[in-house]
């Protein structure tokens, strides 16, 4: 268990704050703690809901890097309303609008449908 805790601490970038109580941590580090808890038992599928919401740009970069790294060894299901997040970390995109799948493809296929991610999202959800 100690080896797994050390690995998850390193993966999630928690080493600098390891001895601090969670209530004293920034939102970014608290997000990382949640990710570490989810990873502790090595799940095949990791589900993340808005993992960068409310984070500063440096924290967003770090969390996105961690998500990309984790995606190399497991399935990561990411729920987000931030389209730049989709482009930064996803290799498959599913848009759900009013309970129906309106797009299922790669970020490249999504970009090919319009000038910007916002435009594509608007087209798919305004019909």
Indicate residue ranges for each PLM-predicted region.
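ABC transporter nucleotide-binding domains
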Residues: 1-97, 102-103
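Conserved beta-strand-loop-alpha-helix hinge in the C-terminal portion
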Residues: 100-122
């Amino acid at each position: 268990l100690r080896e797994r805790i050390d690995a998850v601490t390193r993966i999630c970038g928690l080493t600098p704050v390891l001895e601090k109580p969670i209530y004293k941590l920034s939102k970014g580090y608290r997000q990382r703690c949640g990710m570490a808890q989810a990873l502790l038992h090595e799940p095949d599928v990791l589900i993340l809901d808005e993992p960068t919401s409310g984070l500063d740009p440096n924290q967003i970069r770090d969390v996105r890097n961690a998500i990309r790294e984790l995606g190399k060894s497991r399935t990561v299901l990411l729920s987000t309303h931030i389209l730049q997040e989709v482009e930064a970390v996803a290799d498959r995109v599913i848009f759900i609008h009013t309970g129906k799948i309106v797009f299922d493809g790669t970020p490249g296929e999504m970009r090919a449908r319009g000038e910007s991610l916002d435009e594509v999202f608007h087209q798919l959800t305004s019909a």
